[in-house]
């Protein structure tokens, strides 16, 4: 069975409580909800673990839980992307990253490493942190976003959905 949290903690909590009432849960493959923030549902995961229900996290995980996880190396991927932009002679490189997912933090670390190695300045004004709701409709924060990246010659986007929206906004401008 597949459950979808839509990256909301309340939905995750409801799903976990429902699963704890069942006796037929053989295991779970989980993509963490708002994994870049403290999670109030960790105790529910601990109850599942006490019941010996196997958990495997993918893409991201909660460091407070000792569970196996499979993830991309988001820091290295962002590092390589920013290095590519630097090799193309960009110096004013900004980033649009998600603040509520663990991947956003990891991608930021890769961005920082590439910029620092190249001796380029990391400026807060070139960074835009968005949450899950904003990522679905960047138009809601259009003015703030465009003002922050106005001086940038290149941007690291959190993912392809963000990149697509950014391209459309910049073309309309």
Model-derived features: positions:
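Active-site core of PLP-dependent enzymes with the aminotransferase class I/II
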Residues: 35-36
């Amino acid at each position: 069975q597949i459950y979808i949290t839509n990256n909301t903690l309340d939905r995750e909590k409801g799903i976990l409580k429902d699963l704890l009432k069942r006796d037929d849960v053989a295991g779970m493959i989980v993509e963490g909800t708002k994994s870049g923030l403290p999670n109030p549902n960790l105790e529910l995961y601990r109850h599942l673990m006490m019941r010996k229900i196997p958990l495997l996290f993918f893409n991201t995980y909660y460091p407070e839980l000792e569970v196996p996880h499979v993830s991309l190396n988001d820091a290295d991927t962002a590092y390589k992307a920013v290095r590519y932009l630097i090799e193309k002679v960009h110096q004013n490189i900004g980033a649009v990253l998600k603040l509520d997912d663990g991947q956003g933090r990891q991608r930021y670390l890769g961005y920082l490493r590439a910029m620092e190695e190249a001796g380029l300045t990391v400026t807060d004004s070139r960074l835009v942190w968005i949450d899950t709701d904003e990522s679905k409709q960047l138009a809601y924060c259009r003015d703030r976003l465009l003002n922050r990246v106005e001086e940038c010659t290149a941007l690291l986007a959190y993912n392809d959905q963000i990149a697509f929206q950014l391209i459309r906004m910049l073309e309309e401008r």
